[in-house]
Amino acid sequence: MDREYVARIEHGLRVIVTAGAAGIGRVIVEALHTCGAYIHVCDVDADAVADLNSALPEVGTTIADVSDASQVDQFFAEAETHLGGLDVLVNNAGIAGPTASIDAISPEDWERTVAVNLNGHFYCARRATPLLRNSENAVMINLSSVAGRLGFQYRTPYAATKWGIIGFTQSLAKELGPEGIRVNAILPGMVEGPRIERVISARAKTMGQSEAEVKTEMLSNVSLRRTVAPNDIAEMVLFLCSSGARNISGQSLSVCGNVETM
């Protein structure tokens, strides 16, 4: 972790992170916790939540599915009680969705991907905004993807929702900017971890290739020829929460090694 960023994060920042018990979300939570932030997270994985409770008992947790507006309402009620307010929302929850040609994607898979990736951002943003209005350092960070600017063959539901998050971010930046609320999107590339391995496996099956061939092909489209570490995403979150980003809003910031095509 870059100590320069840590030094510029306000101690005691009140943060909500969705899907914060595992994966990228967990790394973001750990980075913010190191900075002295007060954090409340939601996740659908009860085992991951239990592990987070054991490792970081100071972090508040709620088991909730962001695709369900009523569960989001309960989550925010618990988070507000725990934190006493809100300075930062990290809209991290998302799913990979199906890997298939458009005519092989079921309406149910399409709707589930939209429900989690896009509706979930909306449900959380609408609950966070009244709280952020009372913050002197109000920040909303939405997790999109490089697929949200390039498209992604055989991953149409995922790419469509991630494009949607970019439009969602830019619209809210204009709407909420006059109230001092900064809104940005982070666009990760190939982030190391179980999710990208599942994506590679599904793509290999769809394309009739080996997983090694798919990974090599995907990395050949990255200028730096390497994957992204979850901590790289956490570093960007820290920066966007810092005073150094006080005039950054409405931006879609890629952390991807320069993905040229997908």
Give residue spans per PLM region:
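Residue(s) in the substrate-gating loop at a strand-loop-helix junction
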Residues: 145
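Short, small/polar-rich loop/turn modules that mediate ligand/substrate recognition or access, typified
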Residues: 177, 182, 248-250
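C-terminal helical subdomain
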Residues: 185, 209-244, 248, 255-257
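Substrate-binding pocket helix/loop in short-chain dehydrogenase/reductase
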Residues: 100-102, 106-114, 218
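Active-site helix of classical SDR
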Residues: 125, 161, 169
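Canonical Rossmann dinucleotide-binding motif of NAD(H)/NADP(H)-dependent dehydrogenases/reductases
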Residues: 5-40
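Short C-terminal tail/terminal secondary-structure segment
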Residues: 1-9, 96-99, 150, 226, ...
